[in-house]
A protein has these predicted regions:
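A short beta-strand motif characteristic of beta-propeller blades
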Residues: 97-103, 151-155, 208-212, 257-262, ...
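Bacterial N-terminal signal peptides
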Residues: 42-59
């Protein structure tokens, strides 16, 4: 079936053509096309080709611009570091700028971006703030065009030694883990990005079997399961992953049902992350350098299905685990070892609910307290706390292999890496 033609005007386009007239695919060449000269047709084809090239180039340029990042580095201050640093990173060109001080602040050991990407928040891992035995949380506005940070305000963290924080998807609530104080606190975020004092502080209870590291609770991370109000807190001191529900109207935390899950005694859960779709939870245990895998139902960890070592079988030295990240492909899980000074590479067999340790890459320095993947999963930044350097690796999505790119930079005591796409 072909489009019905009517009497034409101008250049021969059918007059008053309707969508109904052309609802089927065209099977013949319209007469107005046939009347074009060969030369004119070639000219049009040439113009179309040129336009196609220009559109492709524009699309490539936009994609390239979208893959330029400001990389923020949280640090421990007091020796060579003065606060939060920033480097410019061009992923397509694999070019890294010189680190510059983005904000001067004490012990910003972990950072988090607001969902709007206009604000950045940092813990102040302190034992005292404004004359009180408590740590701090700082709010910054990200300066457009430069990525520099402008301090908005600071608030107490609700306990000593805050070590991790996150912002919920609504952008209204910030949750912080206070390692030293054994508490988890919720702070409200104002529309202008400033922080209000804590609206909720929950104290953990209990201990476990390690004689020095598990005498009391030590919340080490806070994570909100994607797409839910479930808050997960790995507590190194109690061998539990404590589960809460965040009330997005009040900011209050209430116990989930079940209120926690446990890892093997003496493990010391430090950080955790989900597989794609929240089907599995990977818990990195600091004290034993193992990963515990939980099967989840609606993001809630329900069944411990595996605990696997992140170290080579023949390694006999001292070691603690630090960070864990899932590759965007969902095929690879990476964790860091402090002592062995490596990044462990696991293949994830989802159908079997199993992690397989397939190898290690050197971290490029000593004590890789933190590392992170860029959003595409093509590069990994390894932050080595005790050698004051960040080393960049390329990631092979097919094999999980990490290859040193030869790119690195120096920052005093780097302990957190986050990426912000340059607007």
């Amino acid at each position: 079936m072909v489009c019905r033609e009517r009497k034409t005007a101008g250049f021969g386009f059918p007059k008053n053509r309707t969508v109904e007239d052309c609802r089927c695919r065209i099977l013949s060449v319209p007469r107005w096309n046939q009347r074009l000269s060969t030369l004119g047709l070639k000219a049009l084809l040439g113009l179309a080709s040129l336009l196609g090239v220009l559109v492709s180039l524009l699309g490539w340029q936009q994609a390239a611009l979208a893959e330029k990042y400001w990389v923020y580095i949280g640090t421990y201050t007091g020796k060579t570091s003065r606060g939060i640093y920033k480097v410019d990173f061009d992923l397509p060109g694999m070019k890294i700028g010189q680190p510059e001080l983005a904000a001067e602040v004490r012990n910003p050991s972990f950072l988090a971006l607001h969902p709007s990407r206009e604000f950045l928040y940092a813990v102040g891992e302190l034992q005292e703030f404004e004359g009180k035995r408590v740590g701090a949380v700082s709010a910054f506005a990200i300066e457009p065009g430069t990525g520099r940070l402008q301090l908005l305000n600071q608030q107490p963290s609700g306990g000593t030694g805050p070590c991790h924080l996150t912002v919920d998807a609504s952008g209204r609530w910030l949750v912080v883990a206070n390692y030293g104080g054994g508490t988890v606190a919720v702070l409200e975020i104002a529309p202008d990005g400033q922080l209000k004092p804590p609206v909720c502080v929950v104290a953990h209870e209990g201990q476990s079997v390690h004689p020095t590291r598990q005498r009391q609770p030590h919340p080490h991370q806070v994570r909100i399961a994607p797409g839910t109000n479930l808050v997960l807190v790995p507590d190194l001191g109690t061998d539990r992953v404590v589960l809460y529900r965040l009330d997005r109207d009040s900011g209050k935390l209430s116990p989930n049902d079940p209120p926690f899950v446990t890892v093997p005694p003496g493990s010391g859960p430090r950080h955790l992350t989900y597989s794609q779709g929240n089907r599995f939870l990977f818990v990195l245990n600091e004290l034993t350098a193992t990963v515990s895998v939980f099967r989840c139902r609606e993001a809630v960890p329900m069944e411990l299905v595996q605990t696997v070592s992140a170290l080579p079988a023949d390694f006999a030295g001292e070691n603690t685990a630090a960070e864990i990240v899932v590759h965007p492909s969902n095929r690879w899980v990476f964790s860091s070892n402090r002592g062995h000074d490596s990044i462990a590479i696991f293949r994830f067999h989802e159908a079997e609910a199993k992690l397989e340790l397939v190898g290690h890459a050197p971290s490029g320095g000593r004590t890789p307290r933190n590392f992170n993947l860029d959003p595409s999963g093509r590069v990994l930044f390894s932050a080595n706390q005790n050698t004051d350097n960040v080393v960049i690796y390329s990631v092979d999505a097919e094999t999980g292999r990490l290859t040193d790119t030869g790119l690195s930079f120096q920052v005093g005591a780097p302990v957190c890496i986050i990426f912000k796409q340059v607007p």
